[in-house]
Regions:
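Small beta-barrel nucleic-acid-binding modules, primarily SNase/OB-fold domains
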Residues: 1-168
Length: 168
């Protein structure tokens, strides 16, 4: 965890990040940034990837984003660095692949951004690492990776607002 030692949570009523020594396995994924994990004792937790927002399942590139997430974490041991609990009682975390050699330096969160499978969620991404992620998002956009193949993709937060308006 040396490369992320200085990451701090937003001061908006959130506690400091906590590294979790337990290993987790995927139970199921909802989309490209939310999933359920199980620890070695069989306890499940709902996880939201910190600082990013992936397309919703019914949104363009939603299925691709989820498939990319699954390609990263399915059948792999995972470690969490919890940033905070959100309003939906999800554990908002940096998620890392773990193996016998230790923990991967790059988070799953970062890999989703690098592949063009998620946006950096500026409103919630307040840690120092977010600056790096913004540069990687710009590179993915420039290289037209993932959702950036679309000339003007709709961010999930905007898409959700539009869906709420349609229901009214």
């Amino acid at each position: 965890f040396n490369s992320i030692k200085n990451i701090r949570a937003s001061s908006a009523g959130k506690s400091a990040p906590v590294a979790d020594e337990r290993e987790y396995r995927l139970v199921r994924a909802s989309d490209g940034d939310s999933f359920v994990l199980k620890d070695g004792n069989g306890r499940t937790i709902r996880v939201r990837l910190y600082g990013i927002d992936a397309p919703e399942s019914r949104q363009p590139y939603g299925k691709q984003s989820k498939a990319h997430l699954l390609s990263l974490i399915q059948n792999r041991p995972l470690r969490l660095k919890t940033m905070y609990l959100d309003n939906y009682k999800r554990t908002v975390s940096l998620v890392y692949l773990a193996d016998k050699n230790g923990i991967d330096e790059l988070s799953v969160n970062q890999r989703q951004v690098q592949a063009g499978m998620a946006w950096v969620y500026d409103y919630f991404c307040t840690s120092d690492i977010c600056k790096t992620w913004k540069l990687e998002e710009a590179m993915a956009r420039k290289e037209r990776l993932g959702l950036w193949q679309d000339s003007d993709p709709t961010p999930p937060w905007q898409w959700r607002r539009e869906q709420k308006k349609k229901k009214k």
